Amino acid sequence: MKEKLIQAYMDTAERFAELSHARRLHVGAIVVKDDRIISIGYNGMPAGWDNNCENIVGYTKGEPVLKTKPEVLHAESNAIAKLARSSESGRGSSIFITHAPCIDCAKLIYQSGISSVYYRNSYRDMAGLEFLTKSGIEVTKTE
C-alpha cells in the first residue's frame, strides 16, 4: 500500500478517535478493503448506554484518578462488530488503529480475516502485536 494512502487512512482513524467520549484515551479504527473504508469504530460504551466511560476511583494532587469501566468497547471490536453486521467480508482487509491492539482485540482481528494491521501509538502490553505477528498478520507501526 502506498505511504500516502497509509497516512490518509491513519489520519481518518485519528478523526474517528475524536468522537470517543472517553476521558483517558481516545482510540479510532477503520477497516479498509480494495481502497474503500468498509467499517469504522472508536472506543466507547455500548449503543444506548450513557457515554461515561470511566469511574473516578480516587484523587491525586486534586485531580481525579480514572478507571475505565469494564463495559467499554474498544475501537477495534466496534469496527469488527459493525463489519459483521454488514454485507462486507473482513477477509483480506487492513485495519488502521490509532493505538496498538490489546490481546483480545488482536484475537478478533485474526478471527475476522483481516490480513494487515497499521497502528500509530504503542500500547502498554505488546501481547496483541506478538499474537498478530505469530499468526502471520502483517503489522506496521506508522508515524
Sequence positions of predicted segments:
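Zinc-dependent deaminase catalytic domain
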Residues: M1-E143
